[in-house]
């Protein structure tokens, strides 16, 4: 059994020995206190003296063999009868200043535990220290089996310390109280932890500051790198630009020699700027001619193949004999050969004989001609090249040629040839001996609604054909509606009218209006000018006054009609049939042709145009104020359908009939009820011209044209032609550049029956 008390030998001295023990324990306590202060309480705490187990007890308890061997080795160091337990991270055993164990024979029993020494106040050491050296004092005995952590925990709560050597020993204060030492150690631990936390936080803040400084330095470094790269890139670009400029300033041969890349090849440099302007024009002309030659060759080859396939299909559908089919194919082959020879033949003015002049204009004239080799009659339209340049009519001339050449419709005048010389462009077209619609209006003044319905229906079909080709006529008027030999109409003058091309330019009318207001004092629409006479005011206040068909006014209308014909041959023209949106530069479409149709219909039923005036300026004002100026006279009766159709045509572009539905929208109007649109051209016309010969021009004002002088441009061109003929010269090549490809020949001229 484990005995926690210490037995002294009987007969030992009491008083002297007690004084000696008290002095010896004071020295021991001082050394232990000094030693505890020097050591780190977190690493090692001094062990109380005289705490150990006997070797016999360890053997009886069956301790480990290694521990027994260790105890046997240590027995010689501690004297007889005592062994020492190996220290677990304890410092070395204090110096053997206490010879009490050596001088007193102790029973070989287990020594008292540390808990017994520090837990009880009646132990031998405290008794000796207090002067009570009685060896009969009994200490409480605890066996190892009776010791537990719970008992130690309860003892700690009561202020006593644990006696287990396997728990960390605590430092004793001078008064022997363990609880105060425990609190001091815990407070010291908390202080150390707080200091460590502060240090950790300081280290973290320093690390963060250092990281931020590193990031800023890295960003600055990256920015510097980017700036350096940009500067290097700019320098490289500048060097490349300088090299390109140097290369451009040098010829390829020089640059090749400089770069060392020249080989046995020979380099040619294109420098057209070193050539004269005339040479450059000739080179451009040759280029365009070659391009046009191959384009036309491919086009004619495709058309030739299509004609043969069409004929073979037609022959297959008929039950003809093989001999007859062979004759048809042979006839087609002969016509193709003639056409190829005709294409290679260069036509000129000398190939035609002029019968008479049937029309004049600002830029040319219209002649009745006869081809010398065939004797057929044609209408030749002549246009002056120099005026086309000056008046910016090159696009219009080309458009007119394309429309006439690309259309096979019976509603459009047929074009047979087109060619040119140094001064003029020539269009050889079919001759329509019935004249034009203006001639019929001058002769009969008024049309009935049935006659008007017939001609307006044919005009709708003709305009629809032009629109399907992708063109806008923009100059539909009675002068350009021709009558063929059977009395049906055809449209002509596409893009260029004889003397009316300026009416398509709003600046022209604005200029005329400003000049007229500044010089003649003509008032604006709806205003009254007191400086003019009453008679003039009656004719110039268009908004208020309307033309009434009195005898005097009818005479004025007839006079206007005669002057209207002469006006067509002048350079001034009249805007009677032009839509208002053309003047405003607001953009226009195909609906502008339907306005012209409404104006012509008004003239056929009423007897004069809806905005008739004595001057173009007045007509312009009336058209721009059509809502007030469009009036119907009371003494001329027309049907409600006719008036409704006219009003729906002479209105704003967005509300105009035909704007959205095209020609079909106009065809469905009640005024055209009963019209057979599919067979109208086979219907007998209201008027069929009667001719005495193929050169009969009674329906053309040839007598009036004799008194019309040629335009200054035409007169000057005639003089230049005479001089060029005498000198044998030619016009500059520059004037031929826009007209390359203007030449044209129609294949089916050989079989057309309407050519006279």
Curated annotation (Swiss-Prot):
The active site is at 475 (proton acceptor). GO terms for cellular component: cell cortex; cellular bud; cellular bud neck; cellular bud tip; cytoplasm; cytoplasmic stress granule; incipient cellular bud site; mating projection tip. It is an enzyme of class 2 (transferase). Residues 1-180, 242-261, 707-732 are annotated as: Disordered. Residues 23-34, 242-255 have a biased composition (Low complexity). Residues 673-754 form the AGC-kinase C-terminal domain. This is Serine/threonine-protein kinase CBK1. It comes from Saccharomyces cerevisiae (strain ATCC 204508 / S288c) (Baker's yeast).
């Amino acid at each position: 059994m484990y005995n926690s008390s210490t037995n002294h030998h009987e007969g030992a001295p009491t008083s002297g020995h007690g004084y000696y023990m008290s002095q010896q324990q004071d020295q021991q306590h001082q050394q232990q206190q000094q030693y505890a202060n020097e050591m780190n309480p977190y690493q090692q705490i001094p062990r109380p003296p005289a705490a150990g187990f006997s070797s016999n007890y360890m053997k009886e308890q069956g301790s480990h063999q290694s521990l027994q061997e260790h105890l046997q080795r240590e027995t010689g160091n501690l004297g007889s009868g005592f062994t020492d337990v190996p220290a677990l991270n304890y410092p070395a055993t204090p110096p053997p200043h206490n010879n009490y164990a050596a001088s007193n024979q102790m029973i070989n029993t287990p020594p008292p535990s540390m808990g017994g020494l520090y837990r009880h106040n009646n132990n031998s050491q405290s008794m000796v220290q207090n002067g009570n050296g009685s060896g009969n004092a009994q200490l409480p005995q605890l066996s190892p089996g009776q010791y537990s952590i719970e008992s130690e925990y309860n003892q700690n709560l009561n202020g006593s310390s644990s006696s287990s050597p396997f728990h960390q020993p605590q430092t004793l204060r001078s008064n022997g109280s363990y609880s105060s030492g425990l609190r001091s150690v815990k407070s010291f631990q908390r202080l150390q932890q707080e200091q460590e936390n502060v240090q950790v936080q300081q280290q973290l803040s320093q690390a963060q500051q250092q990281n931020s400084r590193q990031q800023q330095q890295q960003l600055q470094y990256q920015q510097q790198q980017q700036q350096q790269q940009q500067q290097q890139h700019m320098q490289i670009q500048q060097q490349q630009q300088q090299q390109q400029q140097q290369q451009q300033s040098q010829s390829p041969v020089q640059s090749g020699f400089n770069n060392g890349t020249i080989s046995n090849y020979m380099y040619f440099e294109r420098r057209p700027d070193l050539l004269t302007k005339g040479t450059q024009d000739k080179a451009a002309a040759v280029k365009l001619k070659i391009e046009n030659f191959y384009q036309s060759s491919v086009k004619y080859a495709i058309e030739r193949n299509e004609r043969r396939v069409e004929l073979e299909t037609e022959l297959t559908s008929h039950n003809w004999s093989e001999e007859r089919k062979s004759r048809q194919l042979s006839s087609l082959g002969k016509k193709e050969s003639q056409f190829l020879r005709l294409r290679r033949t260069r036509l000129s003015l000398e190939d035609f004989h002029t019968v008479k002049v049937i029309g004049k204009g600002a830029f040319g004239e219209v002649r009745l001609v006869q081809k010398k080799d065939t004797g057929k009659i044609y209408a030749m339209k002549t246009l002056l090249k120099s005026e086309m340049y000056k008046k910016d009519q090159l696009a219009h001339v080309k458009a007119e040629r394309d429309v006439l050449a690309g259309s096979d419709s019976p509603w459009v005048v047929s074009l047979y040839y087109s060619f040119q010389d140094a001064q003029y462009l020539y269009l050889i077209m079919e001759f329509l001996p019935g004249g034009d619609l203006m001639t019929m209006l001058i002769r009969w003044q008024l049309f009935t609604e049935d006659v008007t319905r017939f001609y307006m229906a044919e005009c709708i079909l003709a305009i629809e054909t032009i629109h399907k080709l992708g063109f806008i006529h923009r100059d539909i008027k009675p002068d350009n509606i021709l009558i063929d030999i059977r009395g049906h109409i055809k449209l002509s003058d596409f893009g260029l009218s004889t003397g009316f091309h300026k009416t398509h330019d709003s600046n022209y009318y604005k200029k005329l209006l400003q000049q007229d207001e500044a010089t003649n004092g003509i008032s604006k629409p709806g205003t009254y000018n007191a400086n003019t006479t009453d008679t003039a005011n009656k004719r110039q206040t268009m908004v208020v006054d309307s033309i009434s068909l009195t005898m005097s006014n009818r005479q004025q209308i007839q006079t206007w009609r005669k002057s209207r014909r002469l006006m067509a041959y002048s350079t001034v023209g009249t805007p009677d049939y032009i839509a208002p949106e053309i003047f405003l530069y607001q953009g226009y479409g195909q609906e502008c042709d339907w306005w012209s149709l409404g104006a012509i219909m008004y003239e056929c039923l009423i007897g004069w145009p809806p905005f008739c005036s004595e001057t173009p300026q007045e007509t312009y004002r009336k058209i721009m104020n059509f809502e007030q100026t469009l009036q119907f006279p009371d003494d001329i009766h027309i049907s409600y359908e006719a008036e409704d159709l006219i009003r729906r045509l002479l209105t704003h572009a967005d509300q105009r009939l035909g704007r959205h539905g095209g020609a079909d929208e106009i065809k469905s109007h009640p005024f055209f009820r009963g019209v057979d649109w599919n067979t109208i051209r086979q219907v007998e016309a209201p008027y069929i011209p009667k001719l005495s010969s193929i050169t009969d021009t009674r329906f053309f004002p040839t007598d009036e044209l004799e008194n019309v002088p040629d335009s200054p441009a035409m007169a000057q061109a005639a003089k230049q032609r005479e001089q060029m003929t005498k000198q044998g010269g030619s016009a500059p090549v520059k004037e031929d550049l826009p007209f390359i490809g203007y030449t044209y020949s129609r294949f089916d001229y050989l079989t057309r029956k309407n050519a006279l």
